[in-house]
Amino acid sequence: MVCQALLHESSKCVPCSHKFCKACILRFKDCPLCGADIEGIEPDDELQALVDRFIDGHARIKRSHVAGTEEVTGDKNKVIYEDVSMERGAFLVRQAMRAFRAHNIESAKSRLSMCAEDIREELKSSQDNQELCSQLGAVLGMLGDCCRTLGDATSAITYYEESAEFLSKLPQNDLELVHTLSVSLNKIGDLRYYDGDLHSARSYYARSLDVRRTAVIEHSAVASQVIDVATSLAKVADVDRNLGNESVAVEGFEEAIKCLEKLKLGSEEASLEQRRLSVLDFLRKQLDDK
């Protein structure tokens, strides 16, 4: 699969000379465009420089600006900042998501890093801007996903923790923010769990559960929030069981089951009902196995 995002590490197929991202073309033995055998791959620095200039001029949130015949020297460039919620920051994120879906992770990471850098710069002059903090939290979470996919658990945890730090500063009345924050906390918990640090994993799972419990109090009619709470209860209970706290674990599983059994969904919510039944089946098996 070719990512169809802006070229990253532009590379040329030999002998046909068709050009792709390095990570994309390395998967092929034949050119995806013409079908010719690929005898070698060469970097195309000139094309990559053109792509980089396009990104700097049209895709970055910040850019240098010279008015009229104003002379610019050293670091005295006047920098204009666009609204990060507008197309410039969103463009970089879209490019990153295209690359990520096609497993061109280094490309995705590069674009997200640019976006994070620009938002950080914007925050220097607008530290209390909640929208910027929310956007940075989301971008950092995606950077964590990139590092996790690349097998760099340490960097992934660092990004997830920073994401959670920014998102935790914001009012928890936006469901999208609640979801992003709770997922980042759970992902840290997962990585700690896989590393064998169960106490740390439980701490992060419990924080995620607290965020979701608070949200469901204000949004009790939102079915997905109830399912999220049950999922978090299951994560905490699973760690409790592995720590030898069986009675506490059973209480957690039972509470999660009650949450889902009380949840009634309409016929138009088929996907949520499937998710509810899947989680419920898992929870019941945990009690059957005790």
Predicted regions mapped to residue ranges:
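Residue register of alpha-helical TPR repeats
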Residues: 90, 131, 138, 158, ...
